[in-house]
Amino acid sequence: MFKKNDRSQSRERRHMRVRKKIFGTAERPRLSVYRSEKHIYAQLIDDVEGKTLVAASSAEQGFDGVGSNKEGAKLVGKMVAEKALEKGLKKVVFDRGGFIYHGRIKELAEGAREAGLDF
């Protein structure tokens, strides 16, 4: 009998397949996105050094909005883009984290693009 994979297992497998191809550098870091039920998180990662350069989330103290809806995701995208531009980072590689490019993930990407990130 076949055993059905749960959603989180399938997402992790998709993420691993994508991570084989996507790699962030100091000049063009990886914009990694994670979506939980209540919040959304985004960070720019330099995979060569293994360090996070910039991070933003809906769980931060100064966040005005709700992290579980599209408007909140767009705000997080704008927040991470503003922090990246302050550090002189304009070009990034988008890593959707195994999530479908739809809904909150798509809104975060559009918010980051509107604020000035190029991907």
Swiss-Prot record:
<keyword id="KW-0694">RNA-binding</keyword>
<dbReference type="GO" id="GO:0008097">
    <property type="term" value="F:5S rRNA binding"/>
</dbReference>
<dbReference type="GO" id="GO:0006412">
    <property type="term" value="P:translation"/>
</dbReference>
<protein>
    <recommendedName>
        <fullName>Large ribosomal subunit protein uL18</fullName>
    </recommendedName>
</protein>
<dbReference type="InterPro" id="IPR005484">
    <property type="entry name" value="Ribosomal_uL18_bac/euk"/>
</dbReference>
<keyword id="KW-0687">Ribonucleoprotein</keyword>
<comment type="subunit">
    <text>Part of the 50S ribosomal subunit; part of the 5S rRNA/L5/L18/L25 subcomplex. Contacts the 5S and 23S rRNAs.</text>
</comment>
<comment type="function">
    <text>This is one of the proteins that bind and probably mediate the attachment of the 5S RNA into the large ribosomal subunit, where it forms part of the central protuberance.</text>
</comment>
<comment type="similarity">
    <text>Belongs to the universal ribosomal protein uL18 family.</text>
</comment>
<dbReference type="GO" id="GO:0022625">
    <property type="term" value="C:cytosolic large ribosomal subunit"/>
</dbReference>
<keyword id="KW-0689">Ribosomal protein</keyword>
<dbReference type="GO" id="GO:0003735">
    <property type="term" value="F:structural constituent of ribosome"/>
</dbReference>
<keyword id="KW-0699">rRNA-binding</keyword>
<dbReference type="Pfam" id="PF00861">
    <property type="entry name" value="Ribosomal_L18p"/>
</dbReference>
<dbReference type="InterPro" id="IPR004389">
    <property type="entry name" value="Ribosomal_uL18_bac-type"/>
</dbReference>
